Amino acid sequence: MFRKRNLVLESFRRFDSGNVETLISWVLCSRTSKPSLFCTSVKPARLNWEVSSQVILKKKLETALKDHRVDDAWDVFKDFKRLYGFPESVIMNRFVTVLSYSSDAGWLCKASDLTRLALKQNPGMLSGDVLTKLSLSLARAQMVESACSILRIMLEKGYVLTSDVLRLVVMHMVKTEIGTCLASNYLVQVCDRFVEFNVGKRNSSPGNVVKPDTVLFNLVLGSCVRFGFSLKGQELIELMAKVDVVADAYSIVIMSCIYEMNGMRDELRKFKEHIGQVPPQLLGHYQHFFDNLLSLEFKFDDIGSAGRLALDMCKSKVLVSVENLGFDSEKPRVLPVGSHHIRSGLKIHISPKLLQRDSSLGVDTEATFVNYSNSKLGITNKTLAKLVYGYKRHDNLPELSKLLFSLGGSRLCADVIDACVAIGWLEAAHDILDDMNSAGYPMELATYRMVLSGYYKSKMLRNAEVLLKQMTKAGLITDPSNEIVVSPETEEKDSENTELRDLLVQEINAGKQMKAPSMLYELNSSLYYFCKAKMQGDALITYRKIPKMKIPPTVQSFWILIDMYSSLGMYREITIVWGDIKRNIASKNLKTTQDLLEKLVVNFLRGGYFERVMELISYMKENDMYNDLTMYKNEYLKLHKNLYRTLKASDAVTEAQAQRLEHVKTFRKLVGIV
């Protein structure tokens, strides 16, 4: 009693005398309404400190909050909580709201900590609106961990968060790499809860869950592309199909980026035929889609397909008419995720003409292979260089000649011939000349002279004689002896198309460097099909082909295999995959990613391999990768809530049990489970 009295007196001293007199008068005047607070006898009145101090502190807190005096409110709140615990729900809601409106990170941090503590003691103390305001304020301040923590609390309690507000919170979160990691994991959690509540129809669900919308997925998928979380992006695409969210035009382009990063050409090819006869204003929007598809054709070293795609784009044949596709252009179209031969596979709905007006999304990178001007798609010099290099490497120059003429006529052929001469590919340049002449489209004299000049410079006199005869036969010249070796005209033309020449040199040098072979992309595609079909035997045979061919696996190879084992609950097999990953890391053949390691952690938690869990968490810390401890904690509580909770080290029978017990306790301590 004496201690509480001193605290109240100290609180009085923080206010001026006028305020104190006012408060005392207010308390004394309340005798009529609250007679129990004071003695009604004729003896001198004695203040009941136990009751009156609580009333006074409560009034002071309300006044400070009303006047937005955050410092005073915090001091009074601390005194109140020390004496009486948390104030009533109305005051707490007001207090957290006032703190949420602060632009100071310190007050926002206190609001977040206070909220978690209050909800731990009384789960219903704070309203959903207050938690929503707090999460938005935290996200704006880039306190993404705290913001995500509040979002997860609301999800667990069944508070419905409107789509507009959730978009705002997530939009601020995904501005950073850690925020993207948290937002993607939260979106996975929302989708899982939505499927559980709406498909499982469980009565124990805490409340309804709003279905994530297209814009929310686009925000998170776009940030996955921006920060390189392509594997997490792939998981979200499959979740998009699982919860039946329609992919709009933005979604398709963002998904194309993820498929390109993961080397999934077959998945991206499915979209091409469904884009349909889009309006001219949308053609530019799909520039990155075709850029990514063309990139994959080059990665697979499928030069023929790359050439046909380039020709289709330039001739606008890629945009198949809607009538030929046999469906209404306004209705969402259905695509299989994985092979269409898998009957039980997921299917995603797409609407290529739909653009969300409130979506400030898109791909913020420049297209490499496709340009867009005058309402038309075209290819860049980078694409042209890759096509020329690819066709020559595959010894298929006649097809190259046909493609060049179809793309740009004689002018483009002349540019390519000039570039070939500049880098010393004289015979290739001569072959293109012959092909064009055979097709009935002979080149101009200046182009012939360019090749002839190259022959003379390289001392290839026999080839020069052959070319002179051809020029004479074609009627381009009458006297071969009058042809000078190098004329000012040819010297000037040598420097005209330097960009194409330089890009060809880059392609030649890049071809000499060690890269992921095209065969690896083919094997990964087969592996993806077998894993989605749950064909373990064929999947393992395909996976084992990779090291046998002396090709180092990619993170996509491991992700695909882990995803299959995870869907089958075969966690022991995932430990074997982790061993393969470590061997490839040690041999410097593999650079792991945060999303791959995080997937391993979650699966080892599900399987109860806590030694592997701690090993991975330590490895991620050493390599400056973010660990979503709250997600780990939630995963643990779903499956192992009471595991070894009361056991001691002395209770272990074997050394293995003792070690397992120690790993579990270490994990519980790390994620904050007491």
Curated annotation (Swiss-Prot):
The keyword Aminoacyl-tRNA synthetase does not apply. The keyword Repeat applies. It holds the Pfam family TPR_At1g68980. PPR repeats lie at residues 409-443, 444-478, 519-553, 554-584, 593-627. PROSITE patterns: PPR. Keywords: Repeat. It comes from the Eukaryota. Belongs to the PPR family. P subfamily. This is Pentatricopeptide repeat-containing protein At4g17616. It comes from Arabidopsis thaliana. The lineage of its organism: Eukaryota, Viridiplantae, Streptophyta, Embryophyta, Tracheophyta.
